[in-house]
Amino acid sequence: MSTGQPAHNTGVADDPEVVRRALLTRGWYRFGYDSTLADWVSAVIPHARAIADDPAARHAWLRCGGTWFAGVNILPNAPDGSLPAIGDRPAVPPLQGRAIRFLRETMGHGALPLDRAQLSICYPGYPAAPQPDESEAAFRYRRNRDAAHVDGLERDAARNRRLGEAHAFILAIPVAEAGPEAAPFTIWEGSHEIMRTAFRTRLTGLPREAWSQQDVTAAYTTARREAFESCRRVTLSAAPGEAYIAHRLSLHGVAPWEATAGPGAWRPIVYFRPELPALPDGTPDFEAWLSLP
């Protein structure tokens, strides 16, 4: 619907009820500066730099012609977000602040353990080139549609999409200054409800234990097309000490790094995407994934 507009909050001092309404309506919220979170970021920066400079990590995770370090679950944090001191890198305290407190207290995630965080880094020129296994059409989608996706979907051997992981939320924490045109996070407002309806319609009437085996490709691509046509695309950027959350069902991606973005050398973001508590048999709780606010 829109080619992209910078995001603006309407809440005052991140009031929990204002944040909740925004998250459930728009599918995102950006928190203002938080000194407690800023302290966590300051401690984690040396760890992020060490990971980004590690040759083995770069070999494993550098993508798109050297302009994207994917870094999935690469930060060795404990379930509370803390890290021990490693060499000359300081210990990182447990993750605290308004954003994680909102998710725990207002959204009901309580003591849900955090996953090992993703360290996603974009560099000038992203995306410079396709990945080795990326088709021309897929690369065009990356450039023109921000590689927009819903987290938790997986592809099987036939490249069909299935439910794979039941995330609770997406919490994004920038760890360095970067301009708003330096490969910002993008999200289609309200797309989470389009996706919820699409997946619910596709899976209604099927036993819960069969949900993860269903091909949801057609439902997903149709819902994605609807979101592109009817939802406002907004760009989200934030400074260290700020954070933003995205609804787990939202359609989101990363915009290209614009030539006007300025001289910044990197755009690193730490993402926490913990999974909802599993069912007694250890499988993901996709019913909760679809039903929770």
Residue spans for each PLM region:
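Intrinsic-disorder/low-complexity, polar/charged segments enriched in Ser/Thr/Lys/Arg/Asp/Glu/Gln
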Residues: 30, 168-170, 233, 243, ...
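Fe(II)/2-oxoglutarate
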Residues: 1-43
